[in-house]
UniProtKB/Swiss-Prot annotation:
Component of the small ribosomal subunit. Mature ribosomes consist of a small (40S) and a large (60S) subunit. The 40S subunit contains about 33 different proteins and 1 molecule of RNA (18S). The 60S subunit contains about 49 different proteins and 3 molecules of RNA (25S, 5.8S and 5S). GO terms for biological process: translation. Residues 1-24, 240-265 are annotated as: Disordered. It comes from Tetrahymena thermophila (strain SB210). Residues 240-253 have a biased composition (Basic and acidic residues). This is Small ribosomal subunit protein eS1. Belongs to the eukaryotic ribosomal protein eS1 family. It holds the Pfam family Ribosomal_S3Ae. PROSITE patterns: RIBOSOMAL_S3AE.
Amino acid sequence: MTQGKNPGLKAGGGKKGAKKRTIDPLSRKEWYDFRAPIPFSSKSFGKTLVTKSSGNRIASEEIKGRVVESTLADLKDNSNDKAWRKVKLVIDEVDGRNAKTSFYGLDITRDRLCSMIRKWQTLIEARVDCKTNDGYIIRVFTLAFTKKTSAGKQSSTSTCYAKSSQVRAIRRKINTFITNEAAKLGIAEFSKNLIGEDYTKKIEKETKNIFPLQNITIRKVKVLKRPKLDATKIAELYSHEKKGEKATGRDGAPEEQAAQNLLAQ
């Protein structure tokens, strides 16, 4: 009987139990810093790993389009009390080892949402699609809760429920206000107002004649469509960075240029 070759044996013969050479997977990767646009702080708020450029593959192109999520406490100074606010950013450009991002949405933590929901009050939810003056189409979700009037506090009842007609009127007021504000502003200024308390205070003032509200919150923001950002627009979003402050890649050169030089050889 002809004995066949064992495909598991190497040509030169191998010793049983020989150790394989281990390669550190991190040696093939490099770190990139996340940078946030206006209205957030210009400092780095996180890092990500990317496989190094090789062949026709450029690492800086692979990282573009990634969506990252952070809290407002990490993105903005003196905002530790807003750690419940989550911010989504998408990477649009890579400058050296800096991954520059732009606004991509808002959300709140689950524990914050649960802490606002209580008994004996009406929860009002509003949703509207609006367009900023620089071409962003976004969907804004707003939460509001009714509160007792001065007359209700003096009465024995513990509830402060709104009628369905009042809920509809409040919802219309909120949606109209958000739509009008978005049409007047660009995404940088509009996102700044959504994160702050300017809009919630104005909504409370405009709806107090219908029914008093409390705990008005921009619960979520989704970016449905955004324009293509060119170099000029990205420079405007990062005008808060100091001039001349630019991270460098390997050997003091931007990573994209080093990869292109490698391909040209």
